Amino acid sequence: MELSFTKILVILFVGFLVFGPDKLPALGRAAGKALSEFKQATSGLTQDIRKNDSENKEDKQM
């Protein structure tokens, strides 16, 4: 699903209407922090999988 500029504006406008201008910055920070933590977790998981895969390949070669 591709988010165009118009769709992002609509989402922001609806968020502004639902949560109001006072809570919107805090929600944005919380969403950014959650996204950052998710990216770190998936990056760590990807590294673990690659490490285990390379170890398995080395074991098979021996």
UniProtKB/Swiss-Prot annotation:
GO process annotations (BP): protein transport by the Tat complex
Membrane-topology descriptor: Single-pass membrane protein
Superkingdom of origin: Bacteria
An annotated GO cellular component: TAT protein transport complex
Known function: Part of the twin-arginine translocation (Tat) system that transports large folded proteins containing a characteristic twin-arginine motif in their signal peptide across membranes. TatA could form the protein-conducting channel of the Tat system.
Quaternary assembly: Forms a complex with TatC.
Protein name: Sec-independent protein translocase protein TatAc
Organism: Bacillus subtilis (strain 168)
Name of the encoding gene: tatAc
